[in-house]
């Protein structure tokens, strides 16, 4: 089983598909990496030689920001926006959509579950 960027890649999938299990590598990036390594795109992960796995590892380390580094960078970018107090930062801080979507209806994913209106309990009858 190939282990790249701290992730165990699934052995029975094609190398292009299994590379996408790494956070920060999508379809196009995976295809570019396989092409740069000179590997046939139909090769299964279990059929990769140690040399091919090493070549993929080197390409990823040299050219891509993946896993923990990428997550940390994204988090720091959001934190920077919030510290600046700009509009996008305020939207992040309030947990609302950042990119201009409507919030009158929809936006439930960002806003969380609905909070119902609390009604007053009916008064108990006098005795």
UniProtKB/Swiss-Prot annotation:
Which stretches does UniProt call biased (Basic residues)?
Answer: 96-118
The entry's cellular-component GO terms read: cytosol; small ribosomal subunit
Keywords associated with the record? Ribonucleoprotein, Ribosomal protein, RNA-binding, rRNA-binding, tRNA-binding
Residue spans making up a coiled coil are none
Q: Specify the signal sequence span.
A: none
InterPro entries with a match to the protein in the record: Rbsml_uS13_C, Ribosomal_uS13, Ribosomal_uS13-like_H2TH, Ribosomal_uS13_bac-type, Ribosomal_uS13_CS
Q: Which biological process annotations from GO are given for this protein?
A: translation
Please indicate which superkingdom the organism of origin belongs to. Bacteria
For the keyword Ribosomal protein, the answer is yes
Q: Which GO terms describe its molecular function?
A: rRNA binding; structural constituent of ribosome; tRNA binding
- What are the start and end residues of every segment in region (Disordered)? 96-127
Q: Which family does it belong to?
A: Belongs to the universal ribosomal protein uS13 family.
What does this chain do? Located at the top of the head of the 30S subunit, it contacts several helices of the 16S rRNA. In the 70S ribosome it contacts the 23S rRNA (bridge B1a) and protein L5 of the 50S subunit (bridge B1b), connecting the 2 subunits; these bridges are implicated in subunit movement. Contacts the tRNAs in the A and P-sites.
- How is the quaternary structure described? Part of the 30S ribosomal subunit. Forms a loose heterodimer with protein S19. Forms two bridges to the 50S subunit in the 70S ribosome.
Q: What is this protein called?
A: Small ribosomal subunit protein uS13
Species: Myxococcus xanthus (strain DK1622)
The encoding gene is rpsM
